[in-house]
């Protein structure tokens, strides 16, 4: 018994010692937390606490710091009030279980005020059933649970009159409904769950509202509904038949349906050939489109006899010419006088179409008539224009020779015809038109329908009775029509028929004359020579010319680019302009926090008071700047480039506000170089 009592006393004593140890440990922990809180919030306490801590740190005596912590901080009522105010506010306002959540004291220490806090319980959520396994394929979709019905299912056999409708949110991966999408479809839940009739999606706009589906005899329990993602309907597309190996509808990871589209090559054709032309697969320009024979314009010029553009034979050509063109009627047989004939009106007057084959002359006879005319001079020279009284103008349309009538041969016997009326006509013959058709015949282009006129100066001897000659030609052609022999009319100036080579040469010469100014220059040269001869040879074109002075070689390449970028130059210019603007608006500064700048300001201010601005000051400053630029170029230092740039910009545009400072620096050249460099460096640093 004694042993048991002694052992019990020993065990009781050890338990008391253990309790005292734990109690002391907790108490010391609380004291240390209070001391740490005081150090962290020392700025919120009275300033006397900070002074005591400062003296304890400066003394380097750990006992002084120990006494401050155990006697001052632990017994301080201010620290207790601050801790109570700091940790009680979250409990009253935010109901925060963490005392260090909304305060600056965040040292991850164990709180000593756990007893004063009541942990706020979490929100009690409903005990819903977990979603079924079939909806777990897509983790982003969570079906909305539906509470069970409360009515007696056994007492009712007619079903429910009011099906439940649940608003389900639209998830980000679900496409927004539009006119191209089908309305949402819904499937019922498993048999153990209660199916929902219809679900209205609040965030989607569909073309039609979902149908209200009534359910009969639903089982008890919870029901879930999940929308099937609508698949887009491509009703406008009618593609190739579906292939079993490659389905038309494809679903991605989110369940969105995509339709497979098979693209086929398409040939783009013009609107004129779409659906009507045989060669619709060929694309061509509108300028090269085919023209039917009925819509083709009549071919003018000498292309009728060329054969490359017209496939008709000679007999067919003669018949067509006989049908299209009328009788050759002389101008003299009309009911008007020769002097009153209007050139423009007669040329544009339509020709009569009532004719017979016996009244039309052969082709060769009319060709000979045109060749017998004097066609040697095709250009109007200045000397010829002066004597325009002795010549007449023959206006001929650019029609085929076989189609030419006397209406196209208009003789103007007016002696008062001006030169401007003669020059306004173009000088283009059938030879030029024939050569143009030969060059472009392979491209199968048609001759532009443009009336061209020929101007030929004729002497008066040939203008006396041209109409009588035409009448004689017509009479001779009617006599020799049956024989169809090549008859030539005996004219006074009959000429040899030109060959094809000569015609080509003449056409090339006339085309060259139209394209270049050689004839105009040649006429001007002859006019000048004539003027020189009339002046008596005072001056000639072969006089001695002044010898030009030979100049030295000039570099062809561009000068080397500047070593300074434009951005740096712009920055320097803006710095100079800003400093000059500040001085002109606010005045010259006198005080500065830096002693060197302060001394520079005072010295410049003293210099400005005694300085008088003269016209020679600018020249002195410019000379000073040039000398300093040369000095910086000779000394290769890193800062030399920036100094040279500032001086060069000041040399180009020197503001008046900075002129006194440069005059002050220019006056220091007579003093020591160290003093100049000292103030000059301060001057540069002001920008």
UniProtKB/Swiss-Prot annotation:
Residues 277-337, 342-361, 531-564 are annotated as: Disordered. Residues 277-295 have a biased composition (Low complexity). Residues 300-313 have a biased composition (Polar residues). This is Uncharacterized protein C02F12.8. It comes from Caenorhabditis elegans. The lineage of its organism: Eukaryota, Metazoa, Ecdysozoa, Nematoda, Chromadorea.
């Amino acid at each position: 018994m004694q042993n048991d009592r002694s052992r019990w006393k020993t065990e009781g004593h050890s338990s008391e010692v253990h309790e005292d140890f734990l109690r002391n440990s907790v108490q010391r922990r609380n004291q240390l937390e209070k001391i740490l809180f005081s150090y962290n919030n020392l700025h919120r306490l009275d300033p006397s606490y900070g002074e005591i801590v400062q003296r304890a740190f400066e003394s380097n005596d750990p006992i002084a710091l120990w006494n401050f912590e155990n006697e001052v901080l632990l017994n301080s009522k201010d620290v207790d009030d601050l801790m109570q105010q700091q940790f009680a506010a979250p409990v009253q306002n935010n109901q925060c279980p963490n005392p260090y959540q909304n305060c600056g004291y965040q040292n991850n220490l164990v709180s000593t005020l756990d007893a004063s806090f009541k942990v706020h319980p979490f929100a009690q959520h409903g005990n819903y059933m977990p979603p079924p396994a079939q909806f777990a394929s897509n983790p982003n979709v969570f079906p909305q649970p539906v509470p069970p019905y409360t009515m007696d299912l056994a007492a009712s056999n007619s079903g429910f009159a009011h099906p439940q409708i649940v608003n389900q949110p639209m998830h980000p991966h679900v496409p927004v409904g539009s006119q191209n999408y089908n309305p949402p479809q819904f499937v019922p839940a498993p048999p153990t769950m209660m199916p929902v009739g219809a679900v209205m999606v609040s965030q989607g706009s569909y073309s039609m509202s979902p149908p209200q589906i009534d359910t009969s005899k639903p089982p008890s329990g919870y029901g879930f509904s999940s929308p099937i993602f609508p698949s887009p309907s491509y009703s406008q597309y009618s593609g190739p038949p579906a292939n079993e190996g490659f389905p038309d509808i494809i679903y991605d990871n989110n369940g969105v349906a995509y339709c497979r589209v098979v693209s086929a090559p398409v040939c783009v054709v013009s609107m004129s050939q779409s659906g009507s032309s045989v060669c619709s697969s060929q694309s061509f320009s509108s300028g090269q489109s085919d023209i039917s024979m009925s819509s083709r314009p009549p071919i003018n010029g000498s292309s009728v006899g060329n054969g490359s553009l017209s496939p008709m034979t000679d007999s067919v050509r003669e018949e067509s010419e006989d049908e299209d063109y009328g009788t050759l009627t002389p101008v003299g047989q009309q009911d008007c006088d020769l002097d009153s004939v209007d050139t423009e009106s007669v040329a544009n007057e339509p020709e009569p179409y009532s004719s017979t084959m016996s009244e039309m002359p052969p082709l060769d006879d009319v060709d000979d008539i045109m060749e017998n005319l004097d066609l040697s001079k095709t250009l109007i020279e200045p000397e010829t224009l002066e004597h325009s009284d002795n010549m007449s103008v023959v206006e001929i349309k650019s029609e085929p020779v076989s189609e030419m009538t006397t209406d196209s041969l208009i003789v103007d016997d007016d002696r008062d015809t001006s030169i401007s009326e003669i020059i306004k006509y173009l000088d283009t013959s059938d030879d030029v038109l024939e050569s143009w058709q030969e060059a472009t015949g392979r491209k199968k282009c048609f001759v532009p329908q443009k009336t061209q006129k020929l101007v030929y100066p004729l002497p008066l001897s040939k203008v006396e009775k041209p109409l009588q000659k035409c009448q004689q030609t017509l009479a001779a052609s009617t006599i020799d029509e049956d024989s169809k022999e090549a008859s030539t009319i005996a004219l006074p100036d009959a000429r040899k028929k030109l060959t094809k080579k000569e015609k080509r040469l003449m056409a090339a010469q006339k085309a060259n004359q139209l394209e270049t100014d050689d004839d105009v220059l040649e006429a001007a040269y002859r006019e000048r020579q004539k003027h020189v001869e009339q002046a008596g040879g005072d001056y000639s074109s072969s006089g001695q010319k002044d010898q030009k002075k030979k100049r030295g070689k000039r570099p062809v390449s561009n000068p080397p680019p500047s070593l300074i970028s434009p951005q740096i130059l712009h920055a320097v210019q803006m710095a100079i302009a800003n400093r000059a603007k500040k001085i002109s608006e606010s005045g010259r500064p006198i005080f500065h926090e830096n002693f060197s700048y302060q001394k520079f300001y005072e010295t410049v201010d003293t210099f400005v008071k005694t300085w008088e601005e003269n016209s020679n000051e600018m020249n002195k400053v410019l000379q000073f700047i040039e000398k300093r630029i040369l000095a910086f170029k000779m000394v290769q230092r890193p800062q030399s480039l920036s100094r040279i740039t500032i001086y060069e910009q000041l040399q180009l545009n020197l503001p008046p506000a900075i002129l006194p400072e440069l005059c002050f620096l220019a006056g220091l050249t007579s003093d020591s170089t160290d003093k100049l460099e000292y103030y000059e460096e301060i001057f540069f640093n002001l920008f």
